[in-house]
């Protein structure tokens, strides 16, 4: 069933973001804003290393540092890189953790998905608020 006149990748982003937001109890506007901001593609193509040696994977640009926590469940880079809703679920799981456990307002906590470094968090936070409005 077609959804309005959106391209397939955008339909995936909207449907998967809202489904993951409900599943992990993350505000849908925050999940949609992060999905729009990240805007990655399926696959392992982003091998740009961060200063800590990690890199981002897939549609939600899921950082490899979090794979250490997911290893015990058998979750691999290849799993995160697949098209479909799985990467959105993993992102919502992470965002939920930030909202529950981090300090600050909800926007700062949500921006921790990108970075906890204040200067990077602030820029990302400002853009999230704009996108979520």
Model-predicted segments: where are they?
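Catalytic glycan-binding domains that act on GlcNAc-containing polysaccharides
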Residues: 2-133
């Amino acid at each position: 069933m077609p959804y309005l006149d959106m391209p397939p990748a955008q339909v995936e982003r909207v449907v998967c973001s809202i489904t993951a937001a409900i599943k992990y109890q993350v505000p849908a506007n925050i999940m949609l804003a992060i999905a729009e901001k990240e805007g990655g593609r399926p696959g392992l193509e982003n091998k740009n290393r961060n200063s800590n040696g990690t890199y981002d994977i897939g549609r939600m640009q899921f950082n490899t540092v979090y794979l250490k926590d997911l290893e015990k469940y058998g979750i691999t880079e290849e799993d995160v890189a697949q098209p479909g809703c799985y990467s959105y679920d993993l992102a919502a799981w992470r965002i939920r953790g930030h909202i529950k456990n981090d300090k600050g307002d909800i926007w700062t906590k949500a921006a921790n998905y990108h970075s906890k470094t204040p200067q990077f968090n602030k820029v990302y936070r400002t853009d999230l608020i704009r996108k979520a409005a």
